[in-house]
Design a protein with these regions (language model features):
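Positively charged n-region of N-terminal signal peptides that target proteins for export
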Residues: 1-4
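Bacterial N-terminal signal peptides
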Residues: 7-15
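General helical structural elements
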Residues: 6-7, 83
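Short Gly/charged-rich anion-binding patches and loops
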Residues: 258
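Beta-rich carbohydrate-recognition and catalytic domains
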Residues: 17-128, 136-255, 264-320, 334-354
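C-terminal structured domain segments
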Residues: 322-323, 327
Length: 354
């Protein structure tokens, strides 16, 4: 009986770690700490250019982080909410900046680095703010951020660029010029630019002369660009947006399939880590899907089970009590993968894989 139990435990371990047919998946991941790496802070204040007054920009919640490498350190750009109102989506979001040598212990900048301002984009950004960043880097060191502008009317996927992760230039709505303006009022978010792994560096890659970006919340779509600023959604023969993957009934992603961190071109294909929401439990868990690198709209494989689920207290207690591990930041550092995620819309966590 003891021998049977040992064999059964080994089988369950292999299944849980993504062995067998899922060797293409990135991971497995483990949590290096039972505490969040970034949490709300009531001491940090910022002169809001829209309100004309000091606000505690990191007071309420810190979550949904991007990640990048700069000067050998891990940098995390996270969504931070003030306390201007109550309820999910009703505060103002700004993007904060943190830096770490080990990926766990963070030094956080005193002020946000991307936020609503009295600029050409205030109609997109205000009053909801700048949300849910994803960051990827070009081979020549330009950082490209895809983020959601939220004016509390229509969420739009927007672009910003930087050479140092601190000073950002906004470029506006990614699909503004696509399709002769047919997408001008389209609600959209969550852009995952396709990258390649070169040593420990993830850099943006071109495919047949164009950049690729998986995007979407209700379903995963694909867009192309020649300059990383102006993007065009891909459509089918009827002119409708592509639905490369969609929610699956009865699974962890039965309600939503929302793109996570920048996708990674590996020897097996293009791996997209995404966020799945359950229609039954409403929890957010993390999944992975493999696309054909020669035909990036073609799905080769997809995990049936999530590889990261809400387990720790701070992943299940906060604004979103149904539980959330919302993955948005992925970097390679000193031979390890660091995956950063939002926890219950309130904290930032990290998981690590060799």
């Amino acid at each position: 009986m003891k021998k049977i139990a040992i064999i059964l435990a080994a089988v369950l371990c292999l299944a849980g770690c993504g062995a067998g047919d899922n060797q293409w998946a990135i991971g497995p991941f483990t949590r290096p700490s039972d505490q969040p790496v970034i949490a709300p802070d009531t001491t940090k204040v910022f002169l809001c250019p829209m309100r004309g007054e000091l606000v505690k920009w990191q007071e309420s919640d810190t979550f949904n982080p991007a990640a990048a490498i700069k000067d050998g350190n891990i940098c995390v750009l996270f969504r931070s909410e003030d306390n201007s109102a109550t309820g999910i989506g009703s505060r103002t979001s700004r993007v904060g900046y943190a830096e770490s040598e080990d990926g766990i212990h963070m030094t956080i900048a005193p002020e946000p680095v991307l936020y609503p301002a009295d600029d050409d984009f205030k109609a997109l950004d205000w009053p909801g703010g700048c949300e849910d960043p994803r960051v990827a880097m070009t081979e020549d060191g330009l950082y490209v951020m895809m983020y959601t502008s939220w004016n509390r009317d229509t969420p739009r996927l927007c672009v910003a660029t930087s050479t140092d992760l601190i000073n950002w230039t906004k470029h506006g709505y990614a699909f503004a010029e696509a399709g002769d303006g047919r997408y001008a009022d389209m609600a959209c978010k969550s852009g995952s630019i396709v990258t390649k792994l070169d040593g420990d560096n993830l850099t943006i890659e071109k495919f047949d002369g164009k950049y690729l970006m998986y995007w979407g919340e209700d379903m995963v779509n694909l867009a192309t660009s020649e300059d990383l600023i102006h993007w065009t959604p891909m459509v089918d023969e009827d002119g409708e947006l592509l639905a490369l993957i969609e929610p699956r009934e009865g699974k962890f992603d039965s309600a939503l399939t929302e793109c996570g961190p920048p996708a990674v071109h590996t020897k097996d294909g293009i791996v997209l880590i995404y966020n799945g929401k359950s229609d039954e439990t409403h929890a957010y868990c993390a999944g992975q899907v493999l696309f054909d690198a020669k035909q990036p709209t073609k799905v080769l494989d997809r995990l049936d089970e999530p590889f990261l689920v809400p387990e720790l207290d701070f992943e299940k207690s906060g604004q979103y009590v149904a539980g959330t591990v919302f993955v948005e930041g992925l970097v390679r550092h000193e031979g390890k993968w660091f995956l950063y995620y939002g926890c219950a819309d309130s904290f930032v966590g990290v998981a690590v894989s060799k």
